[in-house]
């Protein structure tokens, strides 16, 4: 091998769920490229098990009935021993939120939420030894107010006023910003000594390593594949 020739950089990061990072090539004095970040899953919106979060807590123990309950809505009909309840309040219940009678006796949990944001119903999975034929039409069902989310969480955000400008900062040499949950990668990375950094990949930890890192991996949705790695570091003579 000849000492006068520095070795070239590494390959680009691949597209995919995890977003593999491209390693920078090793040369005499050139550091390997950093790992491309994996793209996260897209956040869920609206109803249908996307919005509102699942469950009332992770691995929570049964703490008994809540201090108070408020009306959620009225029982409308049953389907395979599940209840369908027309919701009468604006706030949105958690999935798996416990449902009670007025005397705080638990009868089941929220299973599905369906309809529009302003007009929706829920299905209730009944507890063991509780049967749908024991409920009367239009019977009130109740919920712990601590298991509700404000409706504003599910409404579109108001547009920004015209003329509002985003602040601009000029950081030389900064790596490309990681894309959002479904967005494209950030601008071109500045890179350190040696080759220039590749484009930043969509994901959390993409970015160039020292001495010409490879591009970050593609994000979960529509992220760009990582760019080719920069040239290796300076060769020794």
Curated annotation (Swiss-Prot):
Disruption phenotype annotation: RNAi-mediated knockdown in female germline cells results in a cyst differentiation defect that prevents progression from the 8-cell cyst stage and oocyte differentiation.
InterPro entries: Gar1/Naf1_Cbf5-bd_sf (IPR038664), H/ACA_rnp_Gar1/Naf1 (IPR007504), Transl_B-barrel_sf (IPR009000)
Keywords, in A-Z order: Nucleus, Repeat, Ribonucleoprotein, Ribosome biogenesis, RNA-binding, rRNA processing
GO biological process annotation, one example: rRNA pseudouridine synthesis
Chain intervals for the UniProt region annotation (Disordered): 1-64, 157-237
Superkingdom of source: Eukaryota
Pfam families hit by this protein: Gar1
Location of this chain's protein in the cell: Nucleus, Nucleolus
Any one GO cellular component localisation term in the record: nucleoplasm
GO MF, one example: box H/ACA snoRNA binding
Region annotation RGG-box 1: where it falls in the sequence: 4-56
Function of the protein: Component of the box H/ACA small nucleolar ribonucleoprotein (H/ACA snoRNP) complex, which catalyzes pseudouridylation of rRNA. This involves the isomerization of uridine such that the ribose is subsequently attached to C5, instead of the normal N1. Pseudouridine ('psi') residues may serve to stabilize the conformation of rRNAs. Required for ribosome biogenesis. H/ACA snoRNP complex-dependent ribosome biogenesis is important in female germline cell differentiation during oogenesis.
PANTHER family, A to Z: H_ACA RIBONUCLEOPROTEIN COMPLEX SUBUNIT 1, NUCLEOLAR PROTEIN FAMILY A MEMBER 1 SNORNP PROTEIN GAR1
Name of the protein this chain belongs to: H/ACA ribonucleoprotein complex subunit 1
Species of provenance: Drosophila melanogaster (Fruit fly)
Taxonomic path: Eukaryota, Metazoa, Ecdysozoa, Arthropoda, Hexapoda
Originating gene: Gar1
């Amino acid at each position: 091998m000849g000492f006068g020739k520095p070795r070239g950089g590494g390959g680009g990061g691949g597209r995919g769920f995890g977003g593999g990072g491209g390693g920078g090539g090793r040369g005499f004095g050139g550091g390997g490229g950093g790992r491309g970040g994996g793209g996260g899953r897209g956040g869920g919106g609206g109803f249908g098990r996307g919005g509102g979060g699942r469950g009332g807590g992770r691995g929570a123990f049964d703490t008994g009935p809540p201090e108070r309950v408020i009306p959620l809505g009225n029982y409308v009909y049953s389907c395979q021993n599940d209840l369908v309840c027309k919701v009468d309040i604006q706030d949105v219940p958690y999935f798996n939120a416990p449902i009670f009678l007025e005397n705080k006796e638990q009868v089941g949990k929220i299973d599905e939420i369906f309809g529009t944001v302003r007009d929706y119903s829920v299905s209730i999975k009944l507890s063991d030894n509780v049967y749908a034929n024991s409920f009367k039409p239009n019977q009130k069902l109740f919920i712990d107010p601590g298991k509700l989310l404000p409706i504003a969480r599910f409404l579109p955000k108001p547009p920004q006023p015209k003329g509002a400008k985003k602040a601009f900062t000029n950081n030389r040499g900064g790596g490309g910003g990681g894309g959002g949950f479904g967005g494209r990668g950030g601008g071109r990375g500045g890179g350190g000594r040696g080759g220039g950094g590749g484009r930043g990949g969509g994901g959390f930890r993409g970015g160039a390593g020292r001495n010409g890192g490879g591009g970050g991996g593609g994000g979960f949705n529509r992220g760009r594949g990582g760019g080719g790695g920069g040239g290796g570091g300076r060769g020794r003579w």
